[in-house]
Amino acid sequence: MGNALAVYRDTFPPSPTYSVNDVPDLTGKIIIVTGGNTGLGKETIKVLLQHNATVYLAARSPSKAKAAIDELRDMTGKEALFLQLDLSDLKSIKESARQFLEKEKKLDVLLNNAGVMMSPIEQLTKDGYDLQFGTNVLGHFYFTKLLLPLLLSTAKTTGEARVVTLSSGAGLMVDEIDFNTLKDSPARKKLGTTKLYMQSKLGNMVFSLELARRYADQGIISTSINPGTLKSDLARYVDSLIYKLILKIISYPVPMGTLSPLYAATYPDGKSLNGKYLKPWAREGELSKTATDPELGKELWTWMEEQVAPFESNAS
């Protein structure tokens, strides 16, 4: 009940005290934003470009990315850089990281923004995982893992590197990660697409906090984010007219959703944000007992390591 009340309150947050005008000058900073071709990702990139960051727009579709980059150039006069990334394909993720590592010698911020919400139950990743968990959690884990050596070397040089992972208040609404539902199975179909989405958002929280535990002493700052309920295309798979109407009523403009991720990515006292969960609008929130369970953190991390291990050899 407490989690449900917290989610309800966070759906109607107070007016923000933080704004995009508080973002510092980001000259010299290199940032990746996954899912940057649309919605919250694109709006976040716009602000980062306006504050002089070098930004890689990571997305699956070259044509959609190009259209977004052109639009961002028109709005900001700055050029985002395209990085092809399909988070539902582990082999593609490895290639994307390889391409980035060939181009850059540092990475200040990895903003794990991309996500899938309530996709049709029959949809799986290329490797056979539930599309929502496979994309939202496992895909971002593998991308982060591959870039971690560069993040660590950046932190050694500059004092810090940040990983900002988008979650949702929905992650507070479930009390476990059922590992039997992460690949196609009768248990997965029984759980249903809504709870699978909630479970993936819990997974984002658990991953982000476990990353903070493991690498805080090496300068990594890991934060999870509830950006708020936004008027974006994330809910494109929702087929309930009533639910769509409710979302329309309670949703906020997309630019509002940039406040928490921008705060986590650029707030000068970044170390104070390590392991934290930010809710709308750039306020510190409280994670559930499940999300903060260190045993679940270890279990999820170990499971994800096992899933990506076959792709770690040079032959893959």
UniProtKB/Swiss-Prot annotation:
For this protein, the Enzyme Commission number is 1.1.1.-
Give the active-site positions. 167, 197, 201
Q: Does the keyword Oxidoreductase apply?
A: yes
Residues bound to NADP(+): 40, 64, 86, 113, 145, 197, 201
- Coiled-coil region(s): none
InterPro entries assigned? NAD(P)-bd_dom_sf, SDR_fam
Which GO-annotated molecular functions does the record name?
A: oxidoreductase activity
**UniProt protein name:** Short-chain dehydrogenase/reductase eriB
Question: What protein family does this chain belong to?
Answer: Belongs to the short-chain dehydrogenases/reductases (SDR) family.
Q: What biological function has been recorded for the protein in this entry?
A: Short-chain dehydrogenase/reductase; part of the gene cluster that mediates the biosynthesis of erinacines, cyathane-xylosides that show unique biological activities, including leishmanicidal activity, stimulating activity for nerve growth-factor synthesis, and agonistic activity toward the kappa opioid receptor. The role of eriB within the pathway has still to be determined.
Tell me the Pfam families matching this sequence. adh_short
Which keywords belong to this entry? NADP, Oxidoreductase
